[in-house]
Design a protein with these regions (language model features):
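Conserved alpha-helical substructure of the radical SAM core
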Residues: 1-118, 122-124
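Disulfide-bonded cysteines in secreted/extracellular proteins and peptides
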Residues: 23, 27-30, 274, 280, ...
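Short, flexible, mixed-charge acidic loops at enzyme active sites
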Residues: 28, 32, 132, 211-218
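Conserved AdoMet/S-adenosylmethionine-binding subsite of the radical SAM
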Residues: 56-57, 61, 79-198, 205-207
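Radical SAM enzyme [4Fe-4S]-AdoMet core and its adjacent flexible, acidic
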Residues: 144-152, 159, 163-275, 279, ...
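A cytosolic small-molecule/anion-sensing beta-strand core signal
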Residues: 288
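Flexible mid-to-C-terminal extensions adjoining Fe-S/redox cofactors in radical SAM and related proteins
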Residues: 299-408
Length: 408
C-alpha cells in the first residue's frame, strides 16, 4: 500500500543564495563558483528586492513550526551591501506574524567590518566562517582571484566578530593537503576560540561540460578525481585521530558536528545533518533569480525543481519528485551498505559521493566508505558509553573520566 502523503511531517528548509555564485575569492576546490555558467544570460547575478520579499513572505508562511530559520549562503554573501540584509530583517519582522525568526549567514570573513559585526550582534545572527585551519593549510587552496592568500584577512574578520561578541562557528574543508594534520588542524580552532566546528570532506570529479563547467554531476561518471579530493584513507585517519583528542579532553566544551551527529544516530535520534540521515531532500536551495534546486550539492539543471515565480515553495519542496530524491538516499543503497553493521550511523552518507562500486561490483557505494567504516569501528566503544550515559540522563562528557580510569 502506498504511504499517505503527509507534506507537513517535516519542516520546509530552503537556503538562499542572494549573490548566486559570485565571490571575491577563487578557492581551487569550490564546487559553486562554476554555477555562474548556468546563468550566463544574467549578467548581474543578484537577488532583487522584489524576489527577496516574495521569498521571505512565502518561506515564513510555508512553515508549520513557531521557529523559522533563514540561511544565507554564497558565493560570498557579504558582496551584497549591508542595506540588503537590513531589508531582510525589516521584511522578516513584517511577515513574522508571531513566529521567532533566526538567521545564519556563511561567509569567507574577508569583507567583515565593524559595521557588519554590529549588525550581526544587534540582530543575533549566527555567522559561519569558512577557514581551513592554520595559515599554511588555509592558504593552500583559499586564495583570491589574483592568487593572493586570504588567511590574514579571514583572521582579521574573526577578531572583529569576537570584539563585537557575535556568535560564530567554523566550517573547514578537509582536502588532500590538510587531512594529514588533524591535530594541528583541531588545536588551531581551539586556539582561536572556535567551539563549534564543521569538518567537511571535499570530493569532486572532473567532467567537461559544453557550457564551461568542469565538475561532474552525481549522475555522471567523471573522468578522474579532482586532485584536491581527500582520500578515504585520509578521511578515516583524520577522523580517528581527531576523535581521540576530542573524546579525552573536550566533550561538552568543543562541538564537532560529525561527532555530535554520530552520537545522535547511536541513540536513535535525528542526526541534525542530512548527510548522515536515512533520507534527505528537506534542504533545498533558492538561487538569486528564484530557481529552486533539490540541494546545495545538486545545483545542476537535472535537479531544478522550478522557479518561485511559477510554483510555490511548498509545491516544489513537497513535490513527488523531491520526495523521491530524498527517499532514494535510502532505497538506492547497494547491498553492501544494507548489510553493513554501521548502516544506522552512516546511512550511505551524501548521495553525491556515491560513485564507487562495492566488492561485488555493485554501483552506488560511497567513495569515502572505507574511511567512515574505520571511524565508526574506532569510536564504537566510546559511543556505546555515551549512549548509556544519555539514556540514564547523565552527561556524555563522563566518557572522559571513564577513559582516565581505564574503564573504556
Amino acid at each position: 500500500m502506498k504511504s499517505t502523503f503527509a507534506p507537513f511531517a517535516r519542516p520546509l528548509y530552503v537556503m538562499s543564495k542572494p549573490i548566486g555564485s559570485a565571490c571575491n575569492l577563487a578557492c581551487d576546490y569550490c564546487y559553486y563558483l562554476e554555477k555562474s555558467h548556468l546563468y550566463k544570460q544574467n549578467p548581474k547575478q543578484v537577488m532583487t528586492d522584489e524576489l527577496l520579499e516574495k521569498f521571505i513572505q512565502e518561506y515564513i508562511e510555508s512553515q508549520t513550526m513557531p521557529q523559522v530559520m533563514f540561511t544565507w549562503h554564497g558565493g560570498e554573501t557579504l558582496m551584497r551591501p549591508l542595506s540588503f540584509y537590513k531589508r531582510v530583517v525589516e521584511l522578516q519582522k513584517r511577515y513574522a506574524r508571531g513566529r521567532t525568526i533566526d538567521n545564519c549567514i556563511q561567509t569567507n570573513g574577508t569583507l567583515l567590518t565593524d559595521e557588519w559585526c554590529e549588525f550581526f550582534r544587534e540582530n543575533n545572527w549566527l555567522v559561519g566562517i569558512s577557514i581551513d585551519g592554520p595559515q599554511e593549510f588555509h592558504d593552500e587552496y583559499r586564495r583570491n582571484r589574483q592568487g593572493k592568500p586570504s588567511f590574514v584577512k579571514v583572521m582579521q574578520g574573526i577578531n572583529l566578530l569576537k570584539k563585537h561578541g557575535v556568535e560564530w562557528n567554523g566550517m573547514a574543508v578537509v582536502n588532500d593537503y590538510n587531512a594529514d594534520y588533524p591535530l594541528e588542524f583541531y588545536r588551531f580552532f581551539k586556539e582561536i576560540g572556535c567551539h563549534y566546528i564543521q569538518f567537511a570532506p571535499i570530493v569532486e570529479r572532473i567532467y567537461k561540460h559544453a557550457d564551461g563547467r568542469h565538475l561532474a554531476t552525481p549522475l555522471q561518471s567523471g573522468d578522474k578525481l579532482a586532485v584536491f579530493s581527500v582520500s578515504p584513507e585520509q578521511w578515516g585517519n583524520f577522523l580517528c585521530t581527531l576523535f581521540d583528542e576530542w573524546v579525552r579532553n573536550d566533550v561538552g566544551t568543543y562541538f564537532i558536528q560529525l561527532f555530535d551527529s554520530t552520537l545522535a544516530n547511536w541513540v536513535g535520534e535525528q542526526p541534525g545533518v542530512c548527510s548522515l540521515a536515512k533520507t534527505c531532500g528537506h534542504a533545498g536551495v533558492i538561487e538569486f533569480n528564484g530557481d529552486v534546486y533539490s540541494c546545495d550539492h545538486f545545483v545542476f539543471p537535472e535537479f531544478k525543481l522550478g522557479n518561485i515565480y511559477e510554483k510555490t515553495l511548498v509545491e516544489m519542496m513537497y513535490s513527488e519528485r523531491q520526495q523521491t530524491f530524498g527517499q532514494e538516499k535510502q532505497t538506492k543503497l547497494p547491498t553492501q551498505c544494507q548489510e553493513c553493521e554501521f548502516l544506522f550511523a552512516c546511512n550511505g552518507e551524501c548521495p553525491k559521493n556515491r560513485f564507487a562500486v562495492t566488492a561485488d561490483g555493485e554501483p552506488g557505494l560511497n567513495y569515502l566508505c572505507k574511511g567512515y567504516h574505520q571511524f565508526f569501528s574506532h569510536v564504537a566503544p566510546y559511543m556505546d558509553f555515551m549512549k548509556r550515559e544519555l539514556l540514564a540522563e547523565r552527561a556524555p562528557s563522563n566518557v572522559m573520566e571513564a577513559i582516565r580510569e581505564g574503564k573504556i
